[in-house]
């Protein structure tokens, strides 16, 4: 299959998925978002495999919003952006936030994942191994999503604890965005 046909097919598949899940988007906005997600599906799908190994490009698997895929990573980033925006809508600032000592297991796991960023980037660059970046951001996205599902971030009444969690989310978003930038794609503001 020619690359131009693959891109076209992926973009159409992503447009179909975005249109089905987001009826509030105009066709133009849905196509724009689908194009961003489609690019992530192609690049992440390709780069997540070791360069020395063959693989089958499975459109259904690579365009899924679940599992080790570009769309899943983007969905995680968009979820974090949404939480940060809602925090700001409450009249709170994202500036001068400090991480707090981790309390729960999922919070500790997320912090541990973030701490391994520099070592992972050094290794990926030294070995010219973008699949290591993909593996890292998948693990980081999983760690964030577990933390998110176990924690009522915006409903937390302890302001210091909530601000610490928001600082953790902000850092997670920055690391994920740095990684996808290195891989050559970006995240939309909403999906």
Residue ranges of predicted features:
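Non-catalytic interaction-recognition regions
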Residues: 1-191
């Amino acid at each position: 299959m020619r690359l131009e046909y693959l891109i076209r097919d992926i973009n159409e598949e992503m447009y179909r998925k975005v249109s089905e899940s987001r009826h509030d988007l105009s066709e133009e906005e849905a196509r724009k978002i689908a194009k961003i997600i489609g690019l992530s599906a192609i690049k992440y799908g390709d780069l997540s495999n070791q360069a020395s190994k063959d693989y089958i490009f499975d459109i259904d698997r690579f365009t899924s919003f679940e599992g080790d895929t570009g769309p899943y990573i983007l969905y995680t980033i968009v979820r974090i952006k949404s939480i940060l925006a809602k925090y700001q809508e409450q009249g709170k600032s994202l500036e001068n936030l400090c991480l707090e000592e981790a309390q729960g297991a999922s919070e500790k796991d997320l912090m541990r994942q973030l701490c391994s960023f520099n070592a992972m980037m050094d290794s990926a660059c030294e070995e010219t191994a973008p699949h290591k970046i993909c593996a890292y951001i998948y693990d980081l996205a999983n760690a964030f999503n577990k933390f998110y599902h176990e924690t009522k971030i915006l409903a937390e009444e302890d302001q210091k604890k909530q601000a610490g969690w928001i600082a953790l989310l902000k850092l997670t978003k920055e690391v994920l965005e740095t990684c996808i930038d290195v891989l050559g794609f970006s995240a939309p503001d909403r999906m």
